[in-house]
Amino acid sequence: IAAMVLSAAKRSGDYQQFAGPQGEVRPGHTDLVKHYKSQGFVDVRGGGRSSFRSTIADVIGGSIARLYLAEHFGTAIFSSICQVGSLEASVSLAGRIEEELAAADGKRVSPEACAALEAALEAELETGDILRTVDRDFAAQAAELITATRKEQDSLGSALEVVAVNVPALIGEPLYQSLKLRLMGSLGGLHAVQACEIGAGRAVSARRGSQNNDPIRKDGYQRNSHGGLLGGMTTGMPLVCRVSFKPTSSIALPQDSVRKDLEEIEYRLQKGRHDPCLGVRAGVTLESRLAIELMNAVLMHQARRVDTDNFELF
């Protein structure tokens, strides 16, 4: 399978400010470390591999993985932006999915329910809101905050929930191919990501064991603090991740920086097209990377075990 994506909107001239041994170093970017690591042999146009443009390959591969997972297991993957700056959503994607599971007696989320949830997420875009989220009120407030911040020539951090439902159980390995480690590497390794949490994430640090342990009955787990992963292996519960992005590094405000020869300067961005909030566009890439890791884990499970069709725990 081969794919080619052509860009007709490139503006290479916007990067002249950063080119050559006297080029200016953008705070928050990889300019300085890439310049010295490559001994000066680096093409700054478009940001290269450090650009979010390169994740189009993830989306192409992820679209194929999603088809495979949906056909074999009914797996569906969703994302919802849940924080912009200090503003947090009051409705969570994981919570919406818990409601669907409760309606289905804790088993699988039906194709109809998956389609309805996807339609609800897409509806936010059709109404003119720029955010893909399950919380409509949050979307309107966050859109206003992003617009105001752009006018101030600044940027905002953000966070997204990424959730997979109808996930096959028993995939992943307890050590070197731990699905938790692979997901944290894949999602956490995405450009500008500063944190990747599984399940209840950092909230578990304030809990007692009696609060955090998920009760188990013969029909399955009664809660999902573990986020669908225990010991690097899936339990069949929804796979829940939260990914945090730093504010966009490219801003027009004056900043202290240096040239590549370490001459100190007051840096000002001269040209460029930059989003004030990275999380607005990141959802589809996170969904795609999650799909790729899940499909990879399924294929590894089938390659290593005799009972290759066993994907159930309860």
Feature locations, PLM:
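Alpha-helical support elements that line or immediately flank enzyme active sites
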Residues: 53-75, 79, 177-185, 237-239, ...
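Internal helix-turn-beta structural module
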Residues: 248-314
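Glycine-rich, mobile lid/loop segments that gate access to catalytic sites or pores
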Residues: 36-172
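Glycine-rich anion/phosphate-binding loop at the beta-strand->alpha-helix junction
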Residues: 59, 152-265
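A short glycine/serine-rich beta->alpha loop
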Residues: 42-54, 169-173, 224-229, 273-284
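Glycine-rich, N-terminal phosphate-binding loop and its surrounding beta-alpha-beta segment
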Residues: 1-33
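Short acidic, glycine/tyrosine-flanked loop/strand segments centered on an H-E-D-like triad
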Residues: 20-48, 256-274
